[in-house]
Amino acid sequence: MESSRARRGSRARPSGHRRPLLYCALASVAVLGASATGTVYVKAQAHSGPGAVSSAAPTPSASASGEVSVESVTRSESETEWESESEAAVSVVDRDALLAKAMASVTVPGAARVSVAVLDVGSGLSAVHGTGAFDTASIVKVDILAALLLQAQDAGRHLTAGEKTYATAMIENSDNDSATALWTSVGGAAGLDAANERFGLTGTEGGDGLLWGLTRTTAADQLTLLRQVFGTDSTGSELSEASRTYLQGLMGRIAAGQRWGVSAVADGSSWALKNGWLPRTATGLWDVNSIGRVTSGGHDYLVAVLSDGNATQAKGVALVEAAAEAAMSAFTDT
C-alpha cells in the first residue's frame, strides 16, 4: 500500500526589524492506500504553520519612527481542534476477503480442489481465491485458438477455411481431433507458451507432446486470458478487434449439452464460455473447469473456475457452479 504525505516547512523570521505578519491557509490531502482490493482514505485538512494566527486582520499602530507593530492574536481552542478534524473517507471493498468468505460456504468434497477468479469489467475490480495450478482439460482450446489468431495477425493473414472449420468444432463442440490439429499448427507447447508470454500469462505451461489437455494453468492466468479475449485495444489486448469478435462469437454458440459452468450465474443467455472436463486414468478422478464472460444484474463479469479431484463429472460441475455463484456474491451482495 502506498501513501503520500504533505510536507510542511517553516521559515525563520529575520531578526533586527519587524515585518507585517503573513497569513496563509494550507490545505493538504493525504491519500493513504489505494488499490483495487485495498482501502482508500481521502483526508482533507487545514494546517497552520508554527506561530500562525487566525485570519482576523491585525491592528497595526504607527510609531514616531514609522515602524509598524503587530498585536499578537490568540487562536481559540476550537480553531486548533478544527485543524485535525476535517476528514472524509471513501472505502473500496476488499474483494479478495469477500471472495474468501464466500468460498468458505462452498462444500469441497473429498480430495477435490477448487480455485476461482472474477473480474468486474465495468469497474476493473477483481478477486482471486486459490493459487494452485490445475490441468486445463478442454478450456485450453480457447488459448489454442487465441494463439492461432495471434500468429495469423503477425503473418498479416486471415484464418484459412480449414482452420476455421477446426476452430468452430473445437470451441462450439469441444472436438478433440480439431484441437489436436490446431495445437500442432501453432507449434504445440512452444507455440502456446510464446503466445501466452505476450498475453501476460505467467503460470501456464503447455502440455507435453500432443497432451494439450494436460496444460497446467491457474485461475488468475485464465482471467488474464479472458481479458485478452474480451478486452479492447485500450485495455492492452494483443488480439485485434476482428480476432476478439471471432473468438467471442464461437464461445457464445456452445453446444446445448455443454452450457453448464459459469453460465449458472448469468442472466438468461448472457454468456460466452468454454468448459473442460477430463477423467484422470491414474486416479479415476475428474478435472472440471469453466471460463467465460457472463452478464449478471446488468454488469459484465469475467469468471474462471478450476477444479480437480472430483469423484464424478457431475460432482465437478456442481462444485464449479457453486464456486461461480459464491464468487459472484462477492461482487453483487455488497
Residue locations for each model-derived region?
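Penicillin-recognizing serine hydrolase domain
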Residues: 2-7, 13-68, 75, 90-114, ...
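Active-site SXXK
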Residues: 124, 133-157, 170, 303
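A short glycine/serine-rich beta->alpha loop
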Residues: 128-135, 208-211
